[in-house]
Amino acid sequence: VQAAVATQSQPFLIADEQVTPAQQLAQLHKALADALRLQILRLLKNESFGVLELCRLVAIRQSALSHHLKVLAKAELVATRREGNSIFYRRAFITDDDPLADLKRAAFDAVDTLDIPREQAEQLNQLQQERSELSLSFFQKNAERFSENQGLIVEREHYDSSLMDVVDGLGLSSAACVVEIGPGEGRLLVELARRFASVTAVDNSKDMLDLSRAAIAADGLSNVEFLLGETANARETLSGAADLVVFDMVLHHIATPASTFRDVAALLKEDGLLLVIELCSHDQDWVRNSCGDLWLGFDESELDQWAAMSGLRFEQGSNLALRNGFQIQMRVFRKHAN
C-alpha cells in the first residue's frame, strides 16, 4: 500500500473563477451522470484513498481515473488531503451555505444505496487489510521501543496533565465502563483503571497488549479486561456497554479511521462519550517509517464529520502546541440519544 500511494500525481485544483449558478448545477449533473463516477463516490463514503488505490479498486488506468476525479472535483463532490508526498481523495464536506447542498446530500444518499460489486468489495477488504498489516508489523517489531518512537513526536508529560483534566471533567461516575483503544504501554490505562470500576483495553498487537497488561499488574490493579483485536471485534462483545471510549494518539495508526467511528458508536451507551487525543494534520512524512504512522494527523473537520456520520455530536475540544512544531487536539463527542 505504501508503494502504491507514494507516486501519485498532483491533486486537481479548481480555478478560482466566477461560476454562475447554472454552471454549478450543470457541473454537478455532469459529475453524477456517469456510473463509474457514482462507484467512486460510493467507495469514498467512509474512507479516503490514493489515486493508485482507486485505480486498483475500480480497475481502470490512472489516466482514465484522473479524468473522472477532475470532473468530480470541479463539481465539488470530492476533496483532497495531502499525506506527505501522497494525495488522498475523499468526499467533500457539504456546508449549509452551499446553494446546492440539498442536491448534493440527496445525491450522496442515493449513491449510498448502491451495492459495492463483489470484485470491488474483495479488493477493498484486501487493501484495508494491507494497511492494517503495515501498522501491526511495525508494532510487532518495535514494541520494546514504543516510548522512544512516540517520543520523537510528543513526550507524554507534555499533555498528560491536560488529558487527565479532560477525563476528570467529563462528569463520569466511578462505576463507569471505560474502553481504551490501543493502550500502548498502559500509562493512561492505569489512570483510567484507578478512576473507574470497569476498564477494557483493546489492541490488535499482542506485544503491545502484553506491555499494557504488565503496567496494570505492576500497579496492583485487577479491574481491567484485555481484548486482542480491532474495534470491530470489540463491538461484538461490548456493544452498547461503554460510558467512555478513549483513543490516545492511536487513530493515525488505524487503517480505516472513519469506519472506526462507527464501531465506537456501537460500543457506546446512549449519551456515552468518545475522547480522541490525536495529532493535528501535519507534513512530517518521516513518521511513517520511524513511528509506524499510516496517517499524518487529521483536521478537526475530518474528525467532526466522521463522528457526525456515526451519530456522535461534538461537545468540546482544545489544541496543544508542542515545541517541535506538532500540535495535539483533544476532542470529546457524545452519542445521540435515540
Q: Across the structure, where does each feature detected by a protein language model lie?
A:
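Amphipathic alpha-helical dimerization/coiled-coil segments
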Residues: Q2-E17, D96-R145
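Conserved alpha-helix/loop element of class I SAM-dependent methyltransferases that forms part
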Residues: V154-A176
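Class I SAM-dependent methyltransferase SAM/SAH-binding core
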Residues: V179, E185-A234
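A short acidic, Gly/Pro-enriched loop at the edge of an enzyme's catalytic core
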Residues: E236-V245
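A short SAM/SAH-binding and catalytic strip from SAM-dependent methyltransferases
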Residues: L244-T256
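A short glycine-rich, Lys/Arg-flanked "PGG" loop and its adjoining helix->strand segment in the class I
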Residues: A258-L273
